[in-house]
Design a protein with these regions (language model features):
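A residue-level signal for alpha-helical anchor/packing sites in multi-pass solute transporters
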Residues: 126, 130, 160, 192, ...
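12-transmembrane solute porter fold
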Residues: 12-28, 33-35, 271-479
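Membrane-helix interface/capping residues of multi-pass secondary transporters
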Residues: 48, 78, 102, 133, ...
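Transmembrane-helix bundle of Major Facilitator Superfamily
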Residues: 1-191, 367, 438-442
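Alpha-helical transmembrane segments of multi-pass secondary-active solute transporters
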Residues: 51-52, 81, 139, 173-177, ...
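Hydrophobic transmembrane-helix bundles of small-molecule transporters
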Residues: 164, 168-291, 299
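Intrinsic disorder in cytosolic terminal tails and internal cytosolic loops
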Residues: 1-11, 198-212, 473-492
């Protein structure tokens, strides 16, 4: 299906560099925070539950605003929303770095999540907007390279800053390291993003519409319903050790989801376009890609948590050692993502299938290393090699899947569609961490750490096998023509 094609913007590679700089900063902040948590707890004399919200608050606010922010960028201007999100994020990072208490730190992290939720979907939407064909796949490949590099250097950088600053100042430096990068990104965005950064919506006659109609076009009811749904899905898994009542949120989330779907169908029958046109789920590659993304992130985030738990709690290594174990894998991920971007036009979904298969192989080999270490004393550092399979596979799955999933989505919904994929990733991550860690600790308590870690990795392998089945089905499925003339219309 042909999308809206425009003459390539001569600034598009500079625009991409701005987008990737901001995304690099956000990923550094995510990968660095786990190393900083013990210092935060010591420095602010915080309880375990309070420290958990340093992670959970950011993840929740990020996931809740993603789709609404993506749609706002589609309507009002992606460049302006990207800069706005970066300003919010940078100011919140300053507040986090100087937070006098754990409560203030959690508030700042919550606001950082909102800022990240604003600018992340704009990045995906702008890649869709300014790149086409093979160039788009290459741009997403660079996106994956940045992910790999950020994940690789985040934990060692965090360890270095904490060592330099000590337990009181070190964790603050891990927050403030975002600030100069954020300021640089804002300046570069103001220079390179096309103007106007934001635009007013216009009616069929080309006249600007008023504030109330603009608000109505943003579908505030749909935004609220979907935001509450995401919140009620993610929160129980983040607070799984808390009160039993939180699990009542899951059936409530199912009800809210049904209401949201009905509302979006209603919005499509009105002159106002819905926040998410549900017809995009009729696109096979998008629908299957969303499932692949959710299942993949169900498992992949937990891998490195399990590695850290196994190396520190079972083997007695330091946090720095456990962080360095994954460094070669992250570097390989950056290279494989770049390679995949340059070959996606020819390889297509088969690249994703290969990546998933390689990851399953790496996980099974990792289980083998654990067993050999337990039985025969084989060095645990062989896991560096087996995890390289996992790292390389990430570059073959994440960015290629994103590019393939969004390939047929009309440009008018590029930001919202990309945000739907990212929301699936966030939900997959929160549910996966809770489930896989619960399995790991339950088996560990019944047997020992080696058996528990192996059970965790095998659970992830099972999730990846389900991901593989979806990817194979998507590759073999027939492409059916879908009438998308309605959702391709510019909103007004």
């Amino acid at each position: 299906m042909q999308q809206n094609q425009t003459t390539p913007d001569p600034q598009r590679w500079r625009i991409l560099s701005v987008l990737l700089t901001g995304i690099f900063m956000a990923l550094i902040a995510v990968s660095i925070i786990n190393v900083a948590l013990p210092s935060i707890q010591t420095g602010l004399e915080a309880r375990d539950a309070d420290v958990q919200w340093v992670l959970s608050g950011y993840a929740l606010s990020f996931g809740v605003v993603l789709v609404a922010a993506g749609r706002a960028g589609d309507l009002l201007g992606r460049g302006g929303l990207y800069i706005l999100g970066m300003v919010i994020y940078t100011l919140a990072a300053i507040a986090a770095g100087f937070a006098p208490s754990i409560e203030m730190l959690n508030v700042a992290r919550f606001v950082m999540g909102i800022g990240a939720g604003f600018f992340n979907p704009q990045g995906v939407g702008m890649i869709q907007q300014y790149f086409n064909g093979r160039e788009r796949a290459i741009a997403f490949g660079y996106f994956g390279t940045v992910v790999g590099v950020a994940v690789a250097i985040g934990p060692p950088l965090g360890g270095l800053l904490i060592r330099l600053g000590g337990p009181d100042l070190g964790w603050r430096l891990t927050m403030l390291v975002n600030v100069p990068v954020g300021i640089l990104t804002i300046i570069l965005g103001l220079i390179f993003f096309p103007r106007p950064y934001l635009r007013r919506l216009r009616n069929a006659d080309g006249k600007p519409i008023g504030l109330l109609r603009t608000i109505r076009a943003l579908d505030p009811v749909g935004s609220l319903l979907l935001g509450l749904t995401v919140l009620m899905v993610m929160l129980p898994f983040m607070e799984s050790r808390g009160s039993a009542w939180v699990w009542a949120m899951l059936p409530a989330a199912a009800v809210l989801l049904a209401v949201w779907l009905k509302w979006e169908k209603h919005m499509k029958s009105t002159p106002t376009a819905p926040m998410v046109d549900l017809d995009i789920f009729r696109l096979r590659h998008f629908r299957n890609g969303a499932i692949i993304a959710t299942l993949w992130f169900f498992g992949t985030t937990s891998i490195w948590v399990l590695v850290a738990q196994y190396y520190q709690n079972a083997l007695g290594h330091s946090a720095l050692v456990s962080g360095l174990i994954g460094l070669p894998a992250a570097v390989l991920s950056s290279f494989s993502a770049n390679w995949a971007g340059h070959h996606l036009d020819k390889g297509g979904r088969r690249i994703v299938i290969s990546g998933i298969a390689i990851s399953i192989t790496g996980l099974l080999l990792t289980v083998g290393v654990i067993a050999l270490h337990s039985k025969f004393g084989v060095s645990e550092y062989w896991m560096i090699l087996t995890l390289c399979f996992v790292g390389a596979s990430g570059g073959l799955v994440i960015s290629p899947n994103q590019a393939l999933s969004l390939r047929d989505v009309p440009l008018t919904y590029a930001g919202a569609a990309g945000a739907v994929l990212q929301t699936g990733q966030r939900i997959g991550t929160s549910v996966g961490l809770a489930v896989i860690l619960a399995v790991t600790f339950a088996v560990k308590d019944a047997f020992n750490w080696e058996v528990g870690a192996a059970a965790g990795f095998l659970t992830i392998s099972t999730a990846f096998f389900a991901t593989l089945l979806v990817a194979v089905a998507d590759d073999r499925g027939d492409t059916k023509a879908v009438n998308l003339s309605r959702i391709a219309e510019p909103p007004h």
